[in-house]
Amino acid sequence: MFALAEDVATPTPRCTWKSAPMPCYRTTDGILLTIPLPAEEDAGTFTLTVERPGGRIVRQITVDDHAFGRELIFLTDSLYKRAASPREIARDARAVNSILSVESPERRWQGRWREPVPGMKSTGYGVERYYYRATDSTRSITLDTQAKPRGTFAGDTSDAPSPGAPSWRHAGIDLPARRGASIIAPAAGVVVDVGEYLLSGRTVLVDHGQGVVSAYFHLDTATVAKGDIVRAGDRVGRVGSTGLATGPHLHYGVYLHGKDVDPVAWRDMPQWMIQQRPDSAATDRR
């Protein structure tokens, strides 16, 4: 969710969302907030507060419930072994999550975000995915409609809707492409990780500043190194099928203040958001 408190001039912006501190930044038009609404966000009406000299702005924001759908995926034995390795998955998650939570104060990008690879998505954001062995495809499978998978490649699942089936929410979108196709940075940023992980395979993470990090999974090759500065349109890797992938494609994710959000919202962000310019007099978040 994008929010702007217009014409609010304060050297030390302070904002809260659901009674918890929320990073916010000065722009030439006011105070800008980008609030993560991951797929597992509770529905309801919540309070957004922006402190300002002489008082505060308080707004009630309603978050609607949404059904993201479910998907059953049948894997070869070797791929299923990856999905059923909670200890290794949790280890990788600890390493990756600390990077995804980076909150660098400078916004590095400008203009509309681009698509990292051309084409239509094959699986959308937030879909609940359940993983089975290929041999299970001939038997009847029952899902508990009241239970929900928790986590996004981030460790043990709880309340598993189907006993024995590893399950996660899809924390990004899948973009089918031929093996070796170029993957570009959708916006300017700095590469903060190039790694190899059990589920995401060859992975590149790019920090775009002010809590926004983009992720590229299952790469055949990475064409950048940690610390590289990239511009919008620069190549960061090539499409592959490393990690937990049944064929060549790019898993593309966007994380906001450490939480996954729908990448499509960043591609389709409103024009007023694109036009925001950081206040050069204040680049430090308070």
Which residue ranges define each predicted feature?
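Catalytic cores of peptidoglycan-degrading enzymes
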Residues: V117-R286
